[in-house]
A protein has these predicted regions:
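Rossmann-like NAD(P)(H) cofactor-binding subdomain of soluble oxidoreductases
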Residues: 53, 57-154
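Short, intrinsically disordered, charge-balanced linker/junction segments flanking boundaries
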Residues: 156-161
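NAD(P)+-binding Rossmann beta1-loop-alpha1 motif at the extreme N-terminus of oxidoreductases
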Residues: 1-49
């Protein structure tokens, strides 16, 4: 299975690092070339609750076209940044790609899974202009929630609380 994690923040790095211990081929897609270079050189660095620093080597890129279509694309960005991931998601999507957004707030796809009166409605507050609803087929979505507490520290280490 080929899995791309889009977003190199605390949640994206945690999910990518955890998935790297599975047989799946994991790729972390980040926005900035300098972030890709840092992770490529140092791995994903995480501080455990006990303070131990771990380094997880991972395939990282700032060019989603370089890794091609994936079986699963996990979106790990803030809800307001989702629209900016659509070009990366397009590059990673094949006919059977499943999308799993791990975002904060009310997900844009929520009304699609509800009965009337919400069914088929677009919530403008979370999907202005219906851009996300039009770009991502709701039948290819897996809803996700995370209850993990992680933060980016100034030194590039992800602290898992």
């Amino acid at each position: 299975m080929r899995i791309a994690v889009i977003g190199g923040g605390a949640i994206g790095c945690l999910i990518a690092a955890r998935l790297s211990s599975t047989p799946a081929r994991i790729a972390l897609v980040v926005r900035r070339p300098d972030a890709a270079a840092d992770i490529r050189q140092n791995g994903i660095r995480m501080a455990t609750p006990g303070g131990r620093i771990t380094r997880t080597p991972i395939h990282v890129t700032d060019d989603p076209l370089s890794i091609g279509p994936q079986d699963l694309a996990i979106l790990c960005v803030k809800a307001y940044a989702l629209k900016g991931t659509l070009s990366a998601l397009s590059a990673l999507s094949g006919p059977d790609t499943v999308v799993m957004p791990v975002v904060n707030g009310i997900p844009w796809w929520y009304p699609a899974a509800q009965p009337a009166p919400l069914a088929g409605r677009t919530l403008a507050s979370v999907d202005p202009g219906g851009v996300l609803s039009q770009a991502i087929d709701p039948t290819r979505l897996i809803g996700a929630l995370t209850y993990v507490a992680v933060e980016n520290q100034d030194d590039g280490v992800i602290r898992h609380v």
